[in-house]
UniProtKB/Swiss-Prot annotation:
The keyword rRNA processing applies. HAMAP family: 16SrRNA_methyltr_G. Pfam families: GidB. Gene3D superfamilies: Vaccinia Virus protein VP39. GO terms for cellular component: cytosol. It comes from the Bacteria. This is Ribosomal RNA small subunit methyltransferase G. GO terms for molecular function: rRNA (guanine-N7-)-methyltransferase activity. The gene is rsmG.
Amino acid sequence: MTGLPDAPEVPPVAVEIFGTRTGSAARYVELLATDGVERGLIGPRETDRLWDRHVLNCAVLADVVPVQADVVDVGSGAGLPGIPLALARPDLRVVLLEPMERRCRFLHEVVATIGLEDQISVVRGRAPDAGIGPDGRRFGIAVARAVAPLERLGAILFPMLRPGGVMLAMRGSRILEELQDARSGLGTQGWHPVDVVRCGEGRVEEPARVLRAVRSSQRTRAESRGGRGDGERHDGRQVRRTSRDSLRSREVGRDQPTRGQSRST
């Protein structure tokens, strides 16, 4: 590992988000900056931004995940967003689904090193088939980070979620344009309501932009005839408050009440 950059220092906000697991989060960042770069999972130019752009950006996704949810991270790669999400929320059970063997080896090593083997499982395979258990078990939450265009991603994740389950797709600055293009197709697939939320605003340097969509009980074209669904909602609550608030959410699988308003489809 000679010549590889050092892991960046732990920012103060990491303690707020990870609490007693901050040390484990720091160890994960160190592994990303060393083994992750050496194995081609993280670009060397990203090491200075590992906390803000990657780990914290993914961890604040916890703001919109309900208590004790079973989560699948589709196309996990280097463990983003699944590992930061699990570190921030010990109540969750997380499956990292990844088709590439070399990435799975890295994920197994990371999970063992940071001591999350009781909380995180690594599964090698492709969605959606590999993400459904032999007993037909489906998940309550599916998360993905830059895996596929939204409409295609919706088709992949739909069979992996039980009715009322939630897709959380992390996207970039063009998220509203992407939603505009994919809205009709997502509705036809059976996603309703659909909205955009911003997680971690006011706490982290780079808030997460997330498309949130609820899986209906069946696929119907009528699902695509609702409202516009192109507003952004702002989720700035602290992670610790999320667990209590999400129990009072009126929708199955939705997050705690958030600041701001959005329109949904």
